Structure formats: C-alpha cells, structure tokens
C-alpha cells in the first residue's frame, strides 16, 4: 500500500494498526532524517538530529541537537546508530507525533 512518499516499503509484514504501510496510519507534514539514538522503549525510538546555530556575538557556529520520539513499526528492524527517515503524523501519544517510514543506512554495528 502506497503512503504517498517516495520510500521503499519493508519486505516483512506486520499487524500493527499504527504502521503506515500495513495499518491505517496516515502521514502528513514534514519528513526528516536522523540517527537512531535509543531503542530502549517498546515500539518507540529516539531519533537525534544535529544542526548548527549561528551565535552573532561571537560570529561562530554552535552545535545543537534535537531528539524526536518516533513510532517504530515491527516491520522495520532498527538498531542504535541507524540512519532513518521519519514522517509527521497525528499524535500517537503524549510525546510521539512521528513514525519511522524508511531505514536509510545501518549503523555498521552488526
């Protein structure tokens, strides 16, 4: 089932209702890329994005990071260090409003 994004669908099927491929979850809004920082929670990963912010006083760049909780469907096998693409969706819980739609690259630790 197509979700309206140019991503590769997972080969494994799942029975998760909050899966954009095999369930009824619709995606809309932003699509972001980041690195999986934590997989400790059940069906949830923390995606970390680093970016630079200019500090005008010192005329330098400062590193910042954002940590976004995202739903990880069972059909997408993730590990810490993987590069993933996440898409915005309706609020799934108090903090989750994104879902993992594609695993771009593995972290190399296999």
Swiss-Prot record:
InterPro entries given in the database record: NA-bd_OB-fold, Ribosomal_uS17, Ribosomal_uS17_arc/euk, Ribosomal_uS17_archaeal, Ribosomal_uS17_CS
Any GO molecular function: structural constituent of ribosome
Biological-process GO terms, alphabetical: translation
UniProt-listed PROSITE patterns: RIBOSOMAL_S17
Coiled-coil spans in chain: none
Assigned keywords, A-Z: Ribonucleoprotein, Ribosomal protein, RNA-binding, rRNA-binding
GO CC, any one term: cytosolic small ribosomal subunit
rRNA-binding is among the record's keywords: yes
Domain of life: Archaea
Family: Belongs to the universal ribosomal protein uS17 family.
Role: One of the primary rRNA binding proteins, it binds specifically to the 5'-end of 16S ribosomal RNA.
Self-association and partners: Part of the 30S ribosomal subunit.
Name of the featured protein: Small ribosomal subunit protein uS17
Organism: Haloquadratum walsbyi (strain DSM 16790 / HBSQ001)
């Amino acid at each position: 089932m197509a979700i309206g994004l140019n991503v590769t669908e997972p080969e494994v099927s799942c029975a998760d209702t909050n899966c954009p491929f095999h369930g009824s979850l619709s995606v809309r809004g932003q699509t972001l890329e980041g690195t999986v920082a934590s997989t400790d929670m059940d069906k949830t990963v923390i995606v970390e994005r680093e970016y630079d912010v200019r500090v005008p006083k010192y005329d330098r760049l400062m590193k910042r990071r954002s940590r976004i909780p995202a739903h990880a469907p069972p059909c997408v096998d993730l590990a810490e260090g993987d590069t993933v693409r996440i898409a915005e969706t309706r609020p799934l819980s108090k903090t989750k409003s994104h879902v993992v739609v594609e695993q771009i690259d593995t972290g190399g630790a296999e």
